[in-house]
Amino acid sequence: MNKEADLKDQAKNFRLFSETLDIMKKAWSEDFFSHQGEFYTYPSPNFIWQHDMSPPKEKVVDLKTNELKQISVLPKPYQKPFPPISQVVDGERSIQWAAENGLNTIMWIPTVKALKKRFEIYKDAKSKAENRDVPLGEGISLVRDMFVAETMEEAEKMAGEHIVNYMRWVCHWRGLGNHMDPDEKLPETKNKLDLLNYEFLHKRNLLFGTPEFVIEKIKELQQELNLQNLQVWSNFPGIKHEDCMRSIKSVSYTHLTLPTIFAV
């Protein structure tokens, strides 16, 4: 979406992302800042400040030329120097880069087996960068699609078609590779999404079913990955609002769920 980005030049994209992040940190943490990099320059060169109600200050304006030297972004964040920053990651290089640059990470689709390798890559890179033994799971949030109903069949009936349709949209570009276990090979099909159905998704990464089933799947994530942060999404396209809210409440407010999960 950035006009400077180029799908054929990932090295450039990394530099672009890194510079953007540097600018964000400056804007949040410094009263006034300037930046001159490969892609961006702030303030814009030769920007002249002339305003009778806001006379120029030497710190931010060249008093001889009235050219703006620094800018400020308001309001500043409450957390100092700035809030924790999370990067959505998937590939090994992105995971390592995030860990080396002090960023938390967000992961989404992969299976537990595939996530374990990603979690370990982040742990190792973060441990090296911070010169300490970082626990597995620290700094990582996992997103899972969730729909809770009274029975397994009801969950599939109410939400199964919608999650499959959504994943069909997502996988249009990426195929099914991100849903596979390490070293797994799928049978050849005429079209790349022929295997995509509810059963294919459910056993890999869906929290769809009864409260008891969802609890057990979350416990598995905790036990296998030492998962510390879970984000669930229930309002995917096609789901009725009242069904979405009922699903969320059944996990958030029943005696079967949060106390049971956090007792692990």
Where are these regions (language model features)?
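Acidic/polar active-site rim loop that often engages polyanionic ligands
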Residues: 1-7
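An alpha-helical appendage that flanks or caps ligand/catalytic pockets
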Residues: 10-76, 113-225
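Hydrophobic faces of well-ordered beta-strands that scaffold small-molecule active sites
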Residues: 85-88, 105-107, 138-144, 230-232
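A conserved active-site cap/scaffold subdomain adjacent to cofactor or substrate pockets
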Residues: 99-111
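Glycine-rich, proline-tolerant flexible connector loops at the mouths of alpha/beta enzymes
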Residues: 234-240
